[in-house]
Amino acid sequence: MSRLYYFNPDHDLALANGSAHFQAPESAMAFADDLSLLPCWFAEEVASEVLSDQEFSRDLNILGLDVATIPLFSKDKIEEFKVEPWGWDMAVRKFFLNNGVAEKLLPTPEKIEEYKKLAHRRLTIAAMDYLRSRSMYPESLPQSAVELLLMSDVNAFVSKHKEVVFKAPWSGSGKGVFWSSGALTPSLSGWCKRVIEKQGSVMGEIAYDRVQD
């Protein structure tokens, strides 16, 4: 079966929301439209198409990729493909269902809930703990992140460290990450409070001097 790729960068926001009726903010929708052709660069070369209202000009295709595009909401065509979105969530599942893709070809709500757990940034805590416990030089690795459940935890974390980074448990496309030096500002405090209310926690990490990217 041919594959149909779809770029949905609002995926992490949709995961955090959890609803099949999630509506992405306009900025995320514009970002998705601007970069809708991104899957052209990693799609399998054989019998692949990308769901986009933009055309992948052969004049610009210097690598000779065997990829074509079909416009959004082409229900009669979408149902012919195995769909491959950037990420699976309940909203994109509903999108494909509404456009004729057979339910048996889509992940179940239970499977998407598993994806959601794996996408939570708390998984990085276990990952770093694993690396540190097996390293000959654990002091050369960063401290694990801390999951902060209450605003009192947030304030205590800021008081303990000179510079910190706060991250929303589910976020993507460069969003949901804020740096803090010294006292917590009112705006950042408000952001942390909203994230805790919506996502259940906020992740705190010690900020390190950047040496190399």
Model-assigned labels for residue ranges:
Residues 157-165:
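Acidic/histidine-enriched active-site and ligand-binding environments that engage anionic O-linkages
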Residues 144, 164-191, 212:
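Glycine-rich phosphate-binding loop of ATP-grasp-fold ATP-dependent ligases
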Residues 13-14, 57-59, 172-175, 210-212:
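Flexible loop/turn segments at secondary-structure boundaries
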Residues 162, 188-213:
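Phosphate-binding site of ATP-dependent enzymes
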Residues 1-41, 45:
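N-terminal-proximal low-complexity accessory segments that begin disordered
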Residues 5-12, 16-18, 53, 88-90, ...:
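Short loop/turn segments at strand-loop or loop-helix junctions that form parts
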Residues 90-91, 151, 169-173, 207-210:
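Short acidic/polar capping segments at secondary-structure boundaries
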Residues 29-44, 50-156:
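Conserved N-proximal alpha/beta basic substrate-recognition cap immediately N-terminal to
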